[in-house]
C-alpha cells in the first residue's frame, strides 16, 4: 500500500536526514504527490526506536482513514484515532488526531506530523500553532501543497528544512488551469456549453453556499446534478452518486477543495476572482484533477 516511486524514495530519505540532524522539516509537495507515503520511513524509524509519534490532521474523516491505513502498515503497534466520537482512548504507540485534540498532549511527541497546515483550522491560527508546539518535545514534520510566507521565510533563514516533490506517482505532468475572463452571465453560458459536452464527472466550484444551491436548482432540469455545501446533510451520499455516475455534476464551495479523490474528475471555478478563492484554494481545486493512473489528465 505504501510502495514508493524513485522520486518519493529520494524525498523520503531527505526527510529522514534532516530530522536526524535535528531540524523540523517542511514537505512542499504537489496535490496527489503522495505526502502520506513520504512520512512512512520517518514514522517507521521513530516507532522502531520506541519513540512517541503523532499525526495531526485538519479533518475528522481523514483522521479515521489515515488511522486505518497506519494500523494496516504497523500491525503490531497500537494506532489510536483521537477526534470527535473517538476520545475514550487517547494513548497508544501512534496517535492520529485532529488539530484541536493536540491540547490533550503536553511535551508528548518525539515526532509530530502536521498535515495540511495550509488549511482551516490551522492556517493563520496562532493558538493552534502554539498548542502543536507544546505537544511536541522533538521534531515536527509539516506537510503542505501551499506553504505560506512565514514557513518559506523560516526555510530561507535556515531554521526549517524543506523537501520538495512536484511529481505524482503516475509520472504525468501536473494539470495546468485554463483561465477564461468573462462577465458572470457569460460564465454561465460558457458553463452550459461545457456541461452539454462533458463526458466525465465534474465539480463546479462557486464562492458562496447560496450560489451553489441556486445553480443546483437552476441546472437540475437539464442535467443530473446536485449542490453540496457545509449545510448539506447527505454529503457522503452525494459524492458516492457522482463516483457511480448517478450524478454528472456537483455544484459546491471550497468545502470540497481538498481531501477528496474522484477518478477522472474535471473541475470548473466560477467567479474565480472572488476573495474566497485565494491562491492556496485554487491550487487545491486544480489538484483534484489528474490524480489517478487511469486518468492522469483532465480539465480545470
Mark where each language-model region is.
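N-terminal pre-P-loop "Q-motif" helix
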Residues: 2-23
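Walker A/P-loop
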Residues: 20-42
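Conserved strand-helix element at the start of the C-terminal RecA-like helicase core
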Residues: 29-36, 46, 51-66, 194-219
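Conserved nucleic-acid-binding Ia/Ib motif block in the N-terminal RecA-like helicase ATPase lobe
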Residues: 48-52, 57-99, 225
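Conserved helicase ATPase core of P-loop NTP-dependent helicases/translocases
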Residues: 80-89, 226-253
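Post-DEXD/H (motif II) to motif III coupling segment of the RecA-like Helicase ATP-binding lobe
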Residues: 107-111, 116-181, 185-186, 190
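Conserved RecA-like helicase motor core of SF1/SF2 enzymes
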Residues: 116-119, 243-248, 254-296
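Conserved segment of the helicase C-terminal RecA-like domain
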Residues: 137-150, 286-300
Amino acid at each position: 500500500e505504501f510502495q514508493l516511486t524513485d522520486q518519493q524514495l529520494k524525498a523520503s530519505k531527505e526527510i529522514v536526514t534532516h530530522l536526524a540532524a535535528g531540524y523540523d522539516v517542511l514537505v512542499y509537495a504537489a496535490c496527489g504527490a503522495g505526502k502520506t507515503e513520504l512520512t512512512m520511513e520517518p514514522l517507521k524509524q521513530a516507532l522502531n526506536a520506541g519513540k512517541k509519534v503523532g499525526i495531526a490532521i485538519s479533518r475528522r474523516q481523514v483522521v479515521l482513514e489515515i488511522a486505518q491505513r497506519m494500523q494496516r502498515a504497523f500491525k503490531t503497534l497500537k494506532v489510536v484515532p483521537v477526534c470527535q466520537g473517538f476520545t475514550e482512548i487517547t494513548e497508544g504507540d501512534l496517535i492520529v488526531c485532529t488539530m484541536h485534540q493536540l491540547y490533550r498532549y503536553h511535551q508528548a511527541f518525539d515526532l509530530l506530523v502536521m498535515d495540511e497546515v495550509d488549511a482551516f483550522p490551522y492556517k493563520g491560527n496562532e493558538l493552534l500553532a502554539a498548542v502543536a508546539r507544546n505537544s511536541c518535545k522533538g521534531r515536527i514534520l509539516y506537510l503542505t501543497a501551499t506553504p505560506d510566507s512565514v514557513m518559506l521565510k523560516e526555510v530561507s533563514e535556515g531554521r526549517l528544512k524543506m523537501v520538495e516533490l512536484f511529481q505524482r506517482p503516475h509520472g504525468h505532468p501536473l494539470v495546468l488551469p485554463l483561465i477564461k475572463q468573462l462577465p458572470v452571465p457569460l460564465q454561465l453560458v460558457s458553463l452550459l456549453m461545457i456541461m452539454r459536452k462533458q463526458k466525465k464527472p465534474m465539480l463546479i466550484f462557486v464562492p458562496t453556499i447560496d450560489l451553489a444551491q441556486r445553480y443546483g436548482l437552476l441546472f437540475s432540469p437539464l442535467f443530473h446534478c446536485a449542490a453540496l455545501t457545509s449545510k448539506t446533510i447527505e454529503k457522503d451520499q452525494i459524492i458516492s452518486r457522482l463516483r457511480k455516475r448517478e450524478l454528472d455534476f456537483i455544484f459546491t464551495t471550497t468545502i470540497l477543495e481538498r481531501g477528496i479523490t474522484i477518478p477522472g474528475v474535471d473541475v470548473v471555478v466560477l467567479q474565480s476572482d472572488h476573495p474566497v478563492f485565494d491562491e492556496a484554494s485554487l491550487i487545491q481545486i486544480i489538484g483534484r484533477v489528474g490524480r489517478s493512473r487511469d486518468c492522469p489528465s483532465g480539465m480545470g
